[in-house]
Amino acid sequence: MIRRPPRSTPKPSSAASDVYKRQCMGRSHGIHAEPITFGLKLASFYAEFKRNRKRLIDAIDEVSTCAISGAVGTFANINPNVEKHVAKKLGLKAEPISTQVIPRDRHAFYFSVLGIIAGSVERVATEIRHLQRTEVYELQEFFSKKQKGSSAMPHKKNPILSENLTGLSRMVRSTVIPALENIALWHERDISHSSVERNIGPDANITIDFALVRLTNILDNMIVYPKKMLENLNITKGLIFSQELMLELTKTGLTREKSYRIVQSFSKKCFAENLNLFDVVQSDSYIMSKISIKKLKSIFSYSKHMKNVNFIFRRVIR
């Protein structure tokens, strides 16, 4: 998992490409919030998997110990140098203090890291699934000419690979609790952990490895729709600039609460009557007595949301 070279991570050169800088809608609670870029979404995933790689390296180091210390860890019938020699030959560290077995907190940490990685895989998969929904459709998994999306409905293109990753992630995470429960062995050892590890050891490692390969292939072949991203940005007709408008009103001397209520009333009017927020504000004499038309146009500009994108990229990818 660590040695396989990553193929689908944003690089500085990629950050400069059009699709990575493409503006799209940022969402919180599933609702339109404020504009971001598609590249920032990917950079967020990149940073998370970079942390995961470090976690996995640390977890492998944590679990890479050797114990040949006798029935209860006292070296009663074996020289400690044997343990040291074997550990060196195997590229392991001698366990500082063992019982009949290596303490299982080490293994619990390793499986917990696999669970975290699975959560990250699912986060990307879930984002793809949401963005491929018909109502959003800003991207989709690759769909070959002869592929079938549904046996009953020929028009469908389902995100089946991302759905599969969601299920696989659940399977990997299901191994974490048993690994944690293996820590509490009786006295200097019982065998309750053995049957668990014989199952979760192969299953968790093989599954997360497969999931990472599948995720890489999805990202390598993903189809992005920039025009749909732009279309979705304009769905709410300027409501996404409500925060800037509210903050600008507070600068004119209004309280934040009053500014909030004013902008909220405008927003409700826009929703109810399918109006553009800019037009509603521009037609309000009270607001226009406090904000110039030039300032109003700057409030409804995407530039403020994009001005620090390169800064964020430089901070993430270095």
Show the residue positions of the predicted features:
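Short, flexible active-site-proximal loops enriched in glycine and acidic residues
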Residues: 17-29, 97
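Internal glycine-rich alpha/beta core junctions
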Residues: 34-185
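N-terminal alpha-helical segment
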Residues: 12, 106, 144-145, 241-245, ...
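Single conserved hydrophobic/aromatic residue that forms the stacking wall/gate
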Residues: 1-16, 20
